């Protein structure tokens, strides 16, 4: 059994001064998670960073990462997430998370698809059913690498980190998605989150002996 406890976590105390001292204008890309938007002062600090990113034409990728226990309400989460989305070049989340942004589960998919008109990359994840990626006016449907999981935590972080890492190493988008999916599959079979994160060589070795399925997209 895994227990996650977050109360007065250090990352939620990020403030505007931290951003000003970080030379954001020199970054090639900014990656944020929705957790940082859940409370002050980190919410205002991150929104300030997004403003600086926009001023300096720096792409922003957001992992929605909605955790109900960190927000005062779903309505507040919807408001702040949508504000942040206006700055994003990429948005990544699962079906439940896009439901928060759109207001209902039924409208989440169409919301994601609509956002892709203004974003370079939108990934709509569906757990065991795989994912649908919207990019370059195309839809990329991918399944998962079936495994016997020990726990669900860490899958989203490993997917995103490995996806972005693969893109930076010049893998094409379809391959990068598969690498992210493989990393997620590896993490859920191990104890812990950060200690379970694989490096690229481990992911590629895993992909040599495991096949991605067609999903249910």
Model-derived regions: residue spans:
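Conserved N-terminal subdomain of the carbohydrate kinase-like
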Residues: 1-32, 203-217
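Residues that scaffold the ATP/ADP-binding catalytic core of kinase and kinase-like folds
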Residues: 3, 28, 40, 101, ...
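Glycine-rich phosphate/pyrophosphate-binding beta-alpha loops
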Residues: 9, 34-38, 184, 190-193
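Acidic, amphipathic alpha-helical patches
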Residues: 20, 81, 149
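Structural alpha-helical scaffold elements that stabilize or flank donor/cofactor-binding regions
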Residues: 22-23, 83-84, 115
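Alpha-helix C-terminal capping/helix-to-coil transition sites in glycosyltransferase folds
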Residues: 25-26, 86-87, 118
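Conserved beta-alpha-beta core of the PfkB/ribokinase-like small-molecule kinase fold
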Residues: 29, 35-110, 129-131
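Conserved phosphate-binding/catalytic region of the ribokinase-like
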Residues: 51, 55, 105-217
